[in-house]
From Swiss-Prot:
SUPFAM superfamilies: LDH C-terminal domain-like, NAD(P)-binding Rossmann-fold domains. One of its GO terms (molecular function) is oxidoreductase activity, acting on the CH-OH group of donors, NAD or NADP as acceptor. The gene is glvG. It comes from Escherichia coli (strain K12). GO terms for biological process: carbohydrate metabolic process. The keyword Signal does not apply. The GlvG polypeptide of 212 residues cross-reacts with antibodies prepared against the full-length 6-phospho-alpha-D-glucosidase (MalH) from Fusobacterium mortiferum. This operon may be cryptic in wild-type K12 strains. This is Putative inactive 6-phospho-alpha-glucosidase. Keywords: Manganese, Metal-binding, NAD. The keyword Metal-binding applies.
Length: 212
């Protein structure tokens, strides 16, 4: 089976170890030969990367692991880019959420005025990653789940229409799982769900139970 090389852009994120564990849990379907982290904050990334190095050494020592702040090193010889960046980091997220609340409107990182502000900041950073990928590994695909997903997806569609990029969000799956728990089911797949809305702002969920 073909083994893949992946770079996680946003390697300094506290969510990155979860991505590593997810990748390791799916080695039977998506085997890795190499895993790299990339971040423009070297100090922050080092803390996360050293922790992940321990995980990989214990669970998958055959996977080559490295981390860097150099785009050429990070994006060369990769098959997939997994991008989850937060432009402005948590200090700006705090402003995105608190400023709208002072004016009596939704204060949320992907919705309302804060979501628009965060989206405008995110576009440039995500496009930069797309350009690095296309320059150093033109055959690679990007899985982008940098928020706000809808704004970023539309920006990449308009500004990089030929880029090999999938913009995704796991919030609908998370909501389905919580709903399944509420109604006493063991798994969200025991429901048939129709989801209306975008990512963190959904208007309705309808469900029907499977027979048997």
């Amino acid at each position: 089976m073909t083994k893949f090389s992946v770079v996680v852009a946003g390697g300094g994120s506290t969510f990155t170890p979860g991505i590593v564990l997810m990748l390791l849990a799916n080695q039977d379907r998506f085997p890795l030969r190499a895993l790299k982290f990339y971040d423009n904050d070297g100090a922050r990334q080092e803390v996360i990367a050293e922790a992940c190095k321990v995980i990989l050494k214990e669970k998958a020592p055959d996977i080559a692991f490295s981390y860097t702040t150099d785009p050429e090193v990070a994006f060369s010889d990769v098959d997939f880019v997994m991008a989850h960046i937060r432009v402005g980091k948590y200090p700006m997220r705090e402003l995105d959420e608190k400023i709208p609340l002072r004016h009596g409107v939704v204060g949320q990182e992907t919705c309302g005025p804060g979501g628009i502000a965060y989206g405008m900041r995110s576009i440039g950073g995500v496009l930069e990653l797309v350009d690095y990928m296309e320059k150093y590994s033109p055959n690679a695909w990007m899985l982008n789940y940098s928020n706000p997903a809808a704004i970023v997806a539309e920006a990449t569609r308009r500004l990089r229409p030929n880029a090999k990029i999938l913009n995704i969000c796991d919030m609908p799956i998370g909501i389905e799982s919580r709903m399944a728990q509420i109604v006493g089911l063991q798994d969200r797949k025991q429901m048939r769900v129709r989801y209306y809305g975008l990512n963190h702002w959904w208007s309705a969920i309808s469900r029907s139970f499977r027979k048997g």
